[in-house]
């Protein structure tokens, strides 16, 4: 199976401690590049998440986000930071002494950030639940990349089949093209009233045939089509291999176009270049 680099997956998590939503999305990228948007208290998960992605993906710009809402504990214990409370009181007393007026309000002390805090939930347990959910999400994400990859595979294979048809068409036309060019050259000699030695004429014909012969280009096109098909069948991370094959196919189609002396063959060469470009666009999406 081949895999697309473009995909999206989402997973909702509902636990006793609250709710969370994981999302993964990816777009084309030459290499593997990961980005994370995590709540501050769970940033410590980033290295573990990065390793999970590295083990399962090879290319793409991957964005992972986590939104979480923990439930407030009805019977949560309150922790008083006595040291901080004492510092706040001393500061307020100093301000009062400097101002010469005002009273120290106990409510203001208790509202100061960090003086009174509810006991936090077990972050380790929550983190483990989140990692387990991420594994499930990653499985769905990879499956989606695979489904998208199969669609791209079908499109590319259709273009390869069309290239094979055009290649066979040109091959079948070549004997007639060579005969037409031979007759055309002889007619020129005759119109110019040149009395050439038959052996010299035959040599010119051979040289002409060699210049316009595209058998090697057609053979290589056919070979590249087969190799590209084999790469698709093997599956895996095929993007770079297929990109190289497109360069080879494009090189042969350019040579075919440069040797063309017939409108039909020129049209086939143009069609080949269109088909190759269509495949190249799809291959940019493959891992």
Swiss-Prot record:
Cofactors that this protein relies on: a divalent metal cation
Keywords assigned: Endonuclease, Hydrolase, Nuclease
GO terms assigned for molecular function: RNA endonuclease activity, producing 5'-phosphomonoesters
Source organism, top-level taxon: Bacteria
NCBIfam families membership: YicC/YloC family endoribonuclease
Family to which the UniProt record says this protein belongs: Belongs to the YicC/YloC family.
Function text: Probably a ssRNA endonuclease.
This protein's name: Probable endoribonuclease YicC
Protein source organism: Haemophilus influenzae (strain ATCC 51907 / DSM 11121 / KW20 / Rd)
Organism classification: Bacteria, Pseudomonadati, Pseudomonadota, Gammaproteobacteria, Pasteurellales
């Amino acid at each position: 199976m081949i895999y697309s680099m473009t995909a999206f997956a989402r997973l909702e998590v509902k636990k006793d401690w609250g709710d969370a939503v994981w999302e993964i999305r990816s777009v084309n990228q030459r290499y593997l590049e990961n980005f994370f948007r995590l709540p501050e208290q769970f940033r410590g998960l980033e290295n573990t998440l990065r390793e999970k992605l590295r083990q399962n993906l090879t290319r793409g710009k991957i964005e992972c986000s986590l939104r979480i809402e923990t439930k407030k504990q009805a019977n949560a214990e309150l922790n008083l930071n006595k040291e901080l409370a004492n510092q706040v009181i001393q500061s307020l007393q100093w301000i009062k002494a400097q101002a010469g007026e005002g009273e120290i309000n106990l409510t203001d002390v208790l509202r100061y950030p960090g003086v009174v805090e509810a006991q936090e939930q077990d972050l380790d347990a929550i983190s483990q639940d989140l990692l387990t959910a991420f594994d499930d999400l990653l499985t769905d994400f990879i499956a989606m990349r695979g489904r998208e990859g199969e669609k791209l595979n079908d499109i590319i294979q259709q273009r390869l089949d069309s290239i094979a048809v055009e290649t066979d068409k040109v091959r079948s036309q070549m004997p007639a093209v060579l005969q037409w060019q031979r007759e055309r050259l002889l007619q020129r000699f005759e119109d110019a009233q040149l009395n050439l030695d038959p052996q010299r004429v035959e040599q010119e014909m051979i040289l002409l045939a060699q210049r316009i012969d595209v058998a090697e280009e057609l053979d290589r096109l056919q070979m590249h089509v087969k190799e590209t098909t084999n790469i698709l069948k093997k599956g895996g991370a095929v993007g770079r291999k297929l990109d190289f094959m497109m360069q080879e196919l494009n090189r042969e189609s350019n040579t075919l176009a440069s040797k063309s002396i017939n409108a039909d063959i020129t049209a086939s060469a143009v069609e080949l270049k269109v088909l190759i470009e269509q495949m190249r666009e799809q291959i940019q999406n493959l891992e």
